[in-house]
Amino acid sequence: MFAPLLKKLFGSKNERDVKRMAKAVQAINALEPQMVALSDEQLKAKTAEFQQRYAKGETLDQLLPEAFAVVREAGKRVMGMRHFDVQLIGGMTLHDGKIAEMRTGEGKTLVGTLPVYLNALSGKGVHVVTVNDYLARRDANWMRPLYEFLGLSVGVVTPFQPPEDKRAAYAADITYGTNNEFGFDYLRDNMAFSLDDKFQRELNFAVVDEVDSILIDEARTPLIISGQAEDSSELYIKINKLIPRLNRQVEEVEGKPTEEGHYSIDEKTRQVELNEQGHQFIEDLLSQNGLLGEGESLYSAHNLSLLTHVYAALRAHTLFHRNVEYIVQGDQILLIDEHTGRTMPGRRLSEGLHQAIEAKEGLPIQAESQTLASTTFQNYFRLYNKLAGMTGTADTEAFEFRQIYGLDVVVIPTHRPIARKDFNDLVYLTQEEKYAAIITDIKQCQALGRPILVGTASIESSEYVSKLLQEAGIEHKVLNAKYHEKEAEIIAQAGAPGSVTIATNMAGRGTDILLGGNWEVEVAALENPTEEQIAQIKAEWQKRHQQVIEAGGLHVIASERHESRRIDNQLRGRAGRQGDPGSSRFYLSLEDNLMRIFASDRVKNFMKALGMQSGEAIEHRMVTNAIEKAQRKVEGRNFDIRKQLLEFDDVANEQRKVIYHMRNTLLSAEDVGETIKEFREETLSATINQHIPPQSLPEQWDIEGLEAALYSDFAVRLPIQQWLDEDDKLYEETLRSKILEQIVAAYYEKEELAGAEALRAFEKQMLLRVLDDLWKDHLSTMDHLRHGIHLRGYAQKNPKQEYKRESFTLFQELLDSIKRDTIRVLSHVQVRREDPAEEEARLRREAEELAKRMQFQHAEAPSMEQAVAGEEEELPEGPAPVVPLEPVRNEQKIGRNEPCPCGSGKKYKHCHGQLD
């Protein structure tokens, strides 16, 4: 009740934040005359001065006014661009570790130079994260002259970069790259066999461009580095031939399924399920084709792999459509990013789904993959000491940014007022009527000389609109995943008078549409242009620019609403940049996916009750509210999926941190002899305890089994029964000591043969190899556990608690296996002299060969049904409270006698610190 009154008196939190920063802007402006008076050399010298002052104890906050004033002056001199006051506010927001929402055309790239320069003064490095390689290279090349003028180095990380170039890029003061490349390099670093092979330094400060795209849209899909597993391409081909014989279960008028058909599709959760009739039918088909034994069930334990293949093929045929979720290019399936409309080369679906799509399209089937390392963007970016982001649309997701990442959103005022007109949605009964209205609108705008941007949700839609325009004789350009190489050229002229551009999801394109076209692109197309030519091109552009402004600016037409309001807002934001005129209009129909799947029947019945005729549209607040409600419903569902993914990955993340810390400790250690000694004693103790239980009677001892186990684990044959027969004083403890002496003596014989230095190097490399192999298998086990854990809900158990409990048990077994397998390998190894450097070089060559075969994937996100199954009764009404997870600061070293952070109640040295 008091909230509106308090807001009126004190302003909103956003207004107070902006007001507070406006005072700092005044201080920066006051320094401007002083900076203008400096020579270039004096301005450059400021960087060294700031670095010295920082080293002596001044904070970055204290340096901020002067540093920002220096960057502003350098921008004027080097690039002819002066930071506006609102851009200074944006820079301060980023430095504070918050998200700056800035409208399209407000100069986000230039804003980033302020906090990037300031934080680079610490010498710890700054990462600037973009959504694609083109933008990473473009922004780095654009801003490089400014940074280098001020004495800072700039690097760019790209896929397939030579290791020495990538290492140099990470060593630079400022490093540009994509979220994928930064994430995969983090995983690669934790697979390295030498400290010299690692790329990244401490993760200090990251500025994420299009932060909503990276931290929200991409958060549902984990980053995975995988290697090849067994080949089962023939099975995919055989099962693929059977799937078309299955029929979808149809719905009656009331919406209830009939008995006819073999499977049902839930379009909301994108899941497909075989019904009872379908199970029987597919089992019969498999039996007839010799893939399933006579009378066997598809659900028998030994047939689960076959069941996985069946469901992968069924999903490939029913949920994945050519030119919507993927395109075929050559003999490859290229996935399409649902949020940006771009293809994702090298990205593959997991769990056999990609192979099933290849079989469906008749392409060569690539080998299946096994996870070698994985993480999520959520957990990767929380490793940075400080995280900030920029985007044109973050306010609709402010709740999620705060809940998941602990990041506040600050809406930065625009430099000029927004002059764009956003017209009401027009809703038609059918898609045919909707598209006819779109063509009419295009013709009217083109007659006025206005440029038009038509936004579609898929390649299929964009090509359909293109076909209609061709039939109407309207010249146009198409920008989608098939023609992305022409992107820069198409966008450059999308603002020319009367031009028509069709584009799939424009989110994350990162290029402004300039009214009248882009004169710089025209100049760049000329070889050695003269001053006269440049002046003529600029003059012609100025005429076109003015012509478009007078006609009303860019008109954005959207052919349907997206699942996210944010992507709709991004599309709208393409018009009306920097105070330019413009307009936007959404055309919808009841046959659109969003309306069909999520909008209520009440809306459909309401429209039909109005007696709408063919070609008529409706503009009504109730319809608009229903659409927004449907979008909020989808956004809420997707938020729940991302939250569930994070909660499950947090369990794996704690284990990941322990394993990666263990790896780094091993890589840094010159001698792992003490670690091997501890492993040997613990493994021996466990082996003896199995056959001679502590404080047991001699009659309970299994001496024969112990002798066999010692040979299996330690490669020594010991006559233990003979020792006991010959020595009556040989009790349990003295026997343990004697066995250990014999095992150690046998191992030292190998050391004498190989040499201490060579054996120490071999121990280190072998321990790393065993750790990596077992971690890889552990990841696979954890995947299987996660995919099936939702079924525990049917047994009235909490799936998340069960997952935590079982994953902890699995992790304890992993640590025991690392010790046991390392000792077993070292004990059985046949000694031959090999130079340690040669051994390391050989391992590095093997790692490089592995890297060539690696695949970098985004696995499919878990379905909503899996994520929340079995937990409905436990969830309170309203949004579940989430503890804010802030970006991880520098982690303090855990004392060996302190409680383990995993929550087991044990001391760290007896739990996850056993291998430190």
Swiss-Prot record:
State which Enzyme Commission number(s) the record gives.
Answer: 7.4.2.8
Instruction: Report the co-factor binding details.
Output: May bind 1 zinc ion per subunit.
Which amino acids does the record list as binding Zn(2+)? C900, C902, C911, H912
Specify which residues bind ATP according to the UniProt entry for this protein: Q87, G105, E106, G107, K108, T109, D512
The record's Gene Ontology cellular component field reads: cell envelope Sec protein transport complex; cytosol; plasma membrane
| Membrane topology value | Peripheral membrane protein
Q: Where is the composition biased (Basic residues)?
A: 906-916
The cofactors required by this protein are: Zn(2+)
Stretches for region Disordered: 857-916
Write one Gene Ontology MF term: protein-exporting ATPase activity
Give the UniProt subcellular location, in the record's own words: Cell inner membrane; Cytoplasm
Reaction(s) the record says it catalyses: ATP + H2O + cellular proteinSide 1 = ADP + phosphate + cellular proteinSide 2
Look up the record and give one Gene Ontology term from the biological process aspect.
intracellular protein transmembrane transport
- Alphabetic keyword roster: ATP-binding, Cell inner membrane, Cell membrane, Cytoplasm, Membrane, Metal-binding, Nucleotide-binding, Protein transport, Translocase, Translocation, Transport, Zinc
Q: What is its main location?
A: membrane
The record's similarity note reads:
Belongs to the SecA family.
Quaternary structure and partners: Monomer and homodimer. Part of the essential Sec protein translocation apparatus which comprises SecA, SecYEG and auxiliary proteins SecDF-YajC and YidC.
Kindly give the NCBIfam families that the UniProt entry links to this protein. PRK12904.1 (NF009538), secA (TIGR00963)
HAMAP family, alphabetically? SecA
Give the protein's biological function: Part of the Sec protein translocase complex. Interacts with the SecYEG preprotein conducting channel. Has a central role in coupling the hydrolysis of ATP to the transfer of proteins into and across the cell membrane, serving both as a receptor for the preprotein-SecB complex and as an ATP-driven molecular motor driving the stepwise translocation of polypeptide chains across the membrane.
- Spell out the PANTHER family in the cross-references: CHLOROPLAST PROTEIN-TRANSPORTING ATPASE, SECA INNER MEMBRANE COMPONENT OF SEC PROTEIN SECRETION SYSTEM
Query: What name goes with this protein?
Result: Protein translocase subunit SecA
Q: Which gene encodes it?
A: secA
